[in-house]
Amino acid sequence: MLVSNHQGYMDILVLGSLDPASFVGKAEIRWWPIFGLFSWWAGTIFLERRNKTALKGPLHETINRLREGGRVVVFPEGTDSDGTGVLPFHSSFFEAAIRAQCPVIPVAIRYSAPGVSSREEVIYWKDRRFLPHLIRLLGVGGIRAQVTFGKPMEPGSDRKALARRVYGEVARMVRVGGAT
């Protein structure tokens, strides 16, 4: 299971280009024009974020995919951020790694582009509208995505403790960059 910070839709394109993986994503994406269809085709595990009782199905699907040897990417911040740090992790999906006895690989993504603020021009966060952001993004040249993979972590038996350990490593990698 890959666990990454999240700065917007570019993260999915970047991580998806490196290795085939399923993503855990918010359920409303399923109904977005074009993206919903691509998400479904790509095997996204849809999660109803505001309904804790609806977590059981996506959690079991994640466990099954991990047990079958699949890669699943989770963004436990639960939303995208501005890239200046890492938001607190929600611990629910760390239970999947524990039940599947699957190592967790911390991942940090950072963006840069010459002459522009990646926070303002590259990262898609907060209440930005998609189409204006995409149009501006297409005009930015030389965007660099730095992806840093941490060492696999054994899950142990406590999802909250696992979430804290992985959070610490992802936050450290975001701060310092490092080998990719």
Model regions: which residues?
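Residue-level preference for the first positions of well-ordered beta-strands
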Residues: M1, T44, R71-F75, P103, ...
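Short glycine-rich anion-binding loops that position phosphate/pyrophosphate groups of nucleotides
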Residues: H6-G8, G78-S81, Y111
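A membrane-cytosol interface segment of integral membrane proteins
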Residues: G43-L66, R71
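Catalytic core of membrane glycerolipid acyltransferases/transacylases, capturing the structured
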Residues: M1-K52
